[in-house]
C-alpha cells in the first residue's frame, strides 16, 4: 500500500497502520479516509498530503 506524507509537518500516513488516534483501522487506504480526516500531528486536511 502507498504511504502519504504531510507536506506541512512531515507526518507519514501508513495504511498498514491506519490512524489509531482517529479510530482509522489498519488496512485503510488514504483514498478511503473520511473527508474530514486531518493530520494527527498538525491538523491540516488530506489536500496537504502527497504520495511518497
Curated annotation (Swiss-Prot):
One of its GO terms (molecular function) is electron transfer activity. Coiled coil: none annotated. Pfam families: Rubredoxin. One of its GO terms (biological process) is alkane catabolic process. The keyword Repressor does not apply. Its cofactor is Fe(3+). Gene3D superfamilies: 2.20.28.10. Binds 1 Fe(3+) ion per subunit. InterPro entries: Rubredoxin, Rubredoxin-like_dom, Rubredoxin_dom, Rubredoxin_ET, Rubredoxin_Fe_BS. Residues 1-52 form the Rubredoxin-like domain. Keywords: Electron transport, Iron, Metal-binding, Transport. The keyword Protease does not apply. Fe cation binds at residues 6, 9, 39, 42. Belongs to the rubredoxin family. Rubredoxin is a small nonheme, iron protein lacking acid-labile sulfide. Its single Fe, chelated to 4 Cys, functions as an electron acceptor and may also stabilize the conformation of the molecule. PANTHER family: RUBREDOXIN, RUBREDOXIN-1-RELATED. This is Rubredoxin. It comes from Thermoanaerobacterium thermosaccharolyticum (strain ATCC 7956 / DSM 571 / NCIMB 9385 / NCA 3814 / NCTC 13789 / WDCM 00135 / 2032). The lineage of its organism: Bacteria, Bacillati, Bacillota, Clostridia, Thermoanaerobacterales.
